[in-house]
Amino acid sequence: MAEQDITREQLAQLLNEDLSREYQAIIAYVVYSQVLKGAEYMNIAAQLEEHAHQELQHALIISRQIDYLGAMPSVTPKPVKTSEKARDMLSFDLDNENETIRNYRDRIRQCEALGEFAMAEQIREILVQEHDHQIDLATALGIEVPNVGAGRPRSKGTR
């Protein structure tokens, strides 16, 4: 959707999709943080607990913006994938973070196109944390941090 063509109603609908993804992240991080086993996952399990708290804050911020736009915030999470394999769970989380980053980059442009600069700024702040989550997950997986903007991976250790 071209940013200049977006309406407040469409933005609220897209933010509701983002809110459903935040709910998904909360559930996934709560579950994964408790079921990851083994010394190699102790650090990331603790980080996932922190991520769950941050995702709840994101959900509250996005809900407030949806209400501000005159819509009702969603109550339904996107489906949460599970696995018996720790690497699979971390990969699911990384895929979700990559999608969230792409979506929030779009939302920032859409908010600005509507003149909603304060809303864009709040989403920028969320985006910073989502990017940190992406780095944490890629590091735990021992892979390069995906560059979701260009579709090419970035060098490990660069931000």
Language model: regions and residue ranges:
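Iron-associated oxidoreductase/ferritin-like identity signal
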Residues: 1-159
